[in-house]
Amino acid sequence: MQKKLKVVTIGGGSSYTPELLEGFLKRYHELPVSELWLVDVEEGQEKLNIIFELCKRMVAKAGVPLTVHKTLDRRLALQDADFVTTQLRVGQLKAREMDERIPLSHGYLGQETNGAGGLFKGLRTIPVIFDIINDVEAICPNAWVINFTN
């Protein structure tokens, strides 16, 4: 029998989370994820709640033995994790708006993944990713970290 897997998704309130879950559900026999923990920050709690409810319905419809959890406590979620995914946006959509508008106001490409906007996003995101990695090293050092964050 294959080991059941625990996946922790940092930025679990993202609109990309249902697509990630869909992949786990479709490939359950090859990748037996039994726990999916959705983690977000307080500012993202409303979106986290919406995505959590959608994910529970998806699991029920699929009939797969996978439990979805949600929390704002990253360290709690990381206990015994096998995989940690990141798909976060530090500063929420307001920060993305600034990443795009500030360069545009100076005649440059307004984009969140490259150019000045990408630099702004990177400067906000890299310290948070390091904090996450430090927690992974301390709490679940054998977990694989998969970064989906731009």
List where the protein language model places each region.
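Metallocofactor- and cofactor-centric catalytic cores in central/energy metabolism, strongly enriched
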Residues: 2-97, 111-114, 118-150
